[in-house]
Structures are given as C-alpha cells and as structure tokens.
C-alpha cells in the first residue's frame, strides 16, 4: 500500500508545472540521522503539500551527503531540477554552507532556485537578548534538571512547545507546597519577585507561541507569514508604550501580580530588545510589491515592479476581465491563479512562483513526530523508518482497487439479472 501511495505522490509531482521543496535533517531517538523531504505542488486546481520521502543518512550528515540523497531521489522520481523554484530549510551549517553546504551544490544544478530560511526555525531573538534579570530567573528554573536543554530548546526553536513554561507557571502553587514539604534547598522558588519575573516570561513566550502557530499550515506562504511578523513588530511598539504607562493588559499573568518599579523597567527594556532582534532576524520584505498577487484587480499595473513586458500585458488583460473578477471573489488566491493559468499563463505562473515556496517547516515537525512513533520501543515489529514513513503521507488515500482482498474474504452472492 505504501508503494501505491508513493506512486500517486510521484505522479502528482511529475504532473505539476513547478514544485518547491522543504527539507531538514534531524537525529531520531535511536541516534540515527533522518532526512525528511516535503514537496509543494500544483495539483487538483490547488497548491498542496506532501511528504516526498524520508531517507536515512547512514554515515555522515555533510552538505554533500544531503545533496546526493535529494539529487538521487529527484532523478528516481523523474523530477527535473529546473522545475524546482524554491527550497526551505532550517538554516543549519550543513545546509547553508557557502562552499560545502547543500545550497552550494544545489546552485550548481539550478542557479535560479530561491532558498528560504524557515520562519519557525530562525532562532528566537529572545534567548540571547532577554534582560539579565529575566535570564537569571529563566536559567535557575532549569538548573540541575535533566530536561534543561529540552526546556530551552522547546522555548527557543519549536515555540509550540512553549506551553512547558505556561504549565510550569500555572502549577506554581503546587510546586511551592511540594518544595515546602520536602524542605527543598531551592529557596528562590518561594520568592514572590522571582515568580513575578517568571509570569512575564510565561506571557511573552505565549505571544511568541501564538505567532509561531499562526504561520503554520498548508495555506501559508511567504507573503502571509511576513504580514504576521510585521504585525507582531508593531504590537511590540504598542506594548512598550503601554508598559511605560504601567498598563499590563497584554500580559495577563504579570498584571495579576505585584509589579514593582524595577520590573516595569526590565519589561520595557526586554520588549525593545526583542523588537530590535526581530527586525534583525526577520528582515523586512516589501510585500507591497506583491499586492498584485493578492488582488490583481485592485492595483495599478504601472506601479507594479519586477514584471516583464509580457507579464504586464497579461496582467492588464486579466485585470479587465469581469468574469475572472467575479471568480476571484469565489476562490482562494491559490486556486484563482491556477484557474487563470489557462488564459493568462505568463502572469499566472509568475504569481504561482511567489505563492508556491514554503515559508515554514511545520510539516517537518509533524514528520519527525511520526518518525519518533515509528521507532518507539512500543513497536513490536521491525520495519525501516523509510517504509513506515511512506504510510504517514498526507496525500489522497491509496488506490484500493489494486489491493488484493485479505485471505479468507467471503464475498456476498449476487443474483443474476
């Protein structure tokens, strides 16, 4: 059945005019390096994501090794490298190295591929730039803990796991009672000022977590993700103004506690540090240049930049097509441009190349969760990760018409007409 699913995915991918890849290498709980490759294609009048393959890195995890696996699989799948318009990665040295990284080898095959750094995996600017007072509180909560690295990793890299901190804070009363009974030496955990600092950390990481989850999903693209990052940056400016006025509505847990003057100053300083580093880690994309992609009927073609003459000509014709204008209001942006491709191919393909690339590795996180389950000690049978990962694909169900019935199946009798 997994072979049937793989065959469907490969056929759909080959039929797509263009495709984008998303890949990442990580080590599973057995210590084995796994490479997940996802593909985004145009299929069934929409843009869809799918797991292309999961490959084990048997020896080293160098950029050249990753390139060889990707390149060989694309050859096996009959997917021309020149049809790939973008690759989204987590920005690890093996991927981004200018000489021996995956990107350098790939550029030799197709210099037009656009590489993007996953929005979710840009290291949180909050970990290294948090005010010293908060960093001390955050660090002491992880001290002497076997899971300290997991907690930091959770809050910094995979922010959806930031719930760990929320759970810790919400159990503060129970923790204090337990430590009192046990006569614990960690006296700072009974310090109200310390818990007030933790309350702010919990609130700010919750905001970061919401931002993180908002840029996930199959309908996300670079434009929508950029919108949300820009909105968050503007909110930080608003929050600092409110904090300077001693208004903490945006930090509900902090607002419930006795906030002293020094803490207000620390919060204000931390928000500014976060804003500065957000600007550094998430460079501004001039999304205004792509308003024609979001709504081609509301822009002046003379103001659109970056288009060739033939594309501008196509856009003018499309903009004045009343039938398409009505269709636009009935469809998603992705479906609209795929629909318009038949009549206006040049401008439609230009739009699709902007919408198609991945902006996040959210499926990567789901994929490695599946891999963890596959190799769990609870499994009572031996099967390779690659085989099992085929069954974890999110594509349409396998073609069961070609699957033989189980042995011993009894078919009902039918009367002859």
Task: Provide a role label for each language-model segment.
Residues 1-417:
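Alpha-helical structural modules in large enzymes and assemblies
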């Amino acid at each position: 059945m997994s072979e049937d699913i793989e065959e469907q995915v490969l056929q759909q991918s080959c039929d797509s005019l263009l495709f984008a890849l998303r890949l990442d290498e990580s080590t599973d709980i057995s210590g084995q390096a796994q490479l997940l490759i996802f593909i985004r294609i145009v299929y069934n009048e929409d843009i869809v994501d799918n797991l292309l393959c999961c490959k084990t890195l048997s020896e080293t995890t160098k950029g050249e090794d990753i390139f060889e696996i990707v390149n060989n699989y694309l050859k096996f799948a009959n997917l021309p490298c020149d049809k790939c318009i973008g690759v989204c990665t987590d920005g690890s040295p093996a991927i981004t190295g200018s000489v021996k990284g995956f990107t350098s080898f790939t550029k030799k095959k197709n210099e037009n591929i656009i590489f993007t750094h996953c929005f979710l995996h840009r290291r949180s600017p909050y970990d290294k730039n948090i005010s010293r007072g908060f960093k001390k509180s955050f660090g002491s909560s992880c001290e002497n803990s076997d899971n300290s690295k997991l907690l930091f990793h959770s809050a910094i890299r995979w922010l959806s796991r930031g719930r760990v901190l929320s759970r810790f804070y919400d159990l503060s009363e129970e923790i204090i009672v337990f430590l009192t009974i046990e006569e614990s030496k960690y006296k700072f955990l009974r310090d109200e000022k310390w818990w007030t600092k933790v309350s702010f950390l919990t609130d700010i990481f919750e905001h970061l977590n919401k931002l993180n989850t908002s840029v996930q999903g199959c309908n996300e693209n670079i434009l929508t993700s950029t919108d949300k990052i820009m909105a968050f940056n503007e909110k930080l400016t608003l929050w600092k103004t409110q904090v300077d006025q001693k208004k903490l509505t945006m930090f509900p847990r902090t607002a419930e506690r006795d906030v002293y003057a020094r803490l207000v100053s620390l919060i204000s300083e931390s928000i500014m540090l976060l804003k500065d580093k957000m600007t550094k880690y998430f460079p501004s994309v001039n999304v205004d240049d792509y308003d024609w992609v979001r709504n081609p009927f509301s822009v002046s073609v003379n103001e659109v930049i970056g288009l060739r003459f033939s594309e501008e000509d196509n856009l003018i014709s499309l903009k004045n097509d009343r039938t398409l204008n009505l269709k636009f209001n009935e469809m998603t942006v992705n479906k609209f441009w795929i629909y318009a491709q038949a009549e206006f191919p040049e401008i439609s393909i230009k739009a699709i190349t902007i919408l198609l690339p991945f902006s996040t590795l959210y499926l990567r996180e789901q994929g490695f969760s599946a891999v963890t389950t596959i190799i769990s000690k609870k499994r009572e049978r031996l099967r390779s990760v690659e085989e099992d990962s085929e069954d974890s694909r999110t594509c349409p169900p396998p073609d069961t018409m070609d699957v033989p019935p189980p042995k011993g199946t009894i078919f009902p009798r039918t009367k002859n007409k």
